[in-house]
């Protein structure tokens, strides 16, 4: 395709800590089992350097899975948060979404290691102060 849009759902993930835009790219990996058993955090950052970047990342955080991800065990794992995040910068959008998630469940940025690893690889930035962020409350 000429362009593609990455549309993940914000949720907790046992191994990666979070499934957002970067982790969503695991859907294009043939052998996900290998990635999940060989430094998953680094693999998530690495895949962002190999694939054609999405023209837009749209994170659906309307209902988010706060525990027992990626599948969940019950409705109690899900919370109505009414959030939506969009950016061309995959690291920035995942950073913002993680900060949002942290309001629902303790999940500091440092625990989602693939964010810093991707920033080191120059995939994007975790420094949200560098960006022109527009917040809309509905």
Regions found by a protein language model. Name each.
Residues 1-138:
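Extended, low-polarity segments enriched in aliphatic/aromatic residues
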């Amino acid at each position: 395709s000429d362009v593609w849009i990455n549309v993940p759902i914000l949720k907790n993930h046992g191994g990666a800590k979070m499934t957002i835009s970067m982790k969503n790219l695991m859907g294009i990996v043939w052998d996900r089992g290998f990635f999940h058993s060989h430094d998953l955090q680094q693999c998530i950052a690495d895949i962002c350097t190999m694939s054609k970047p999405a023209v837009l990342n749209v994170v659906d955080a309307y209902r988010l899975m706060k525990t027992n991800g990626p599948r969940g065990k019950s409705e109690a794992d899900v919370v109505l948060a009414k959030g939506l995040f969009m950016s061309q910068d995959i690291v920035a959008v995942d950073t913002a979404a993680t900060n949002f998630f942290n309001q629902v469940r303790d999940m500091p940025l440092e625990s989602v290691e693939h964010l810093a690893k991707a920033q080191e690889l120059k995939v994007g930035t975790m420094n949200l102060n560098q960006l022109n962020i527009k917040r809309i409350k509905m």
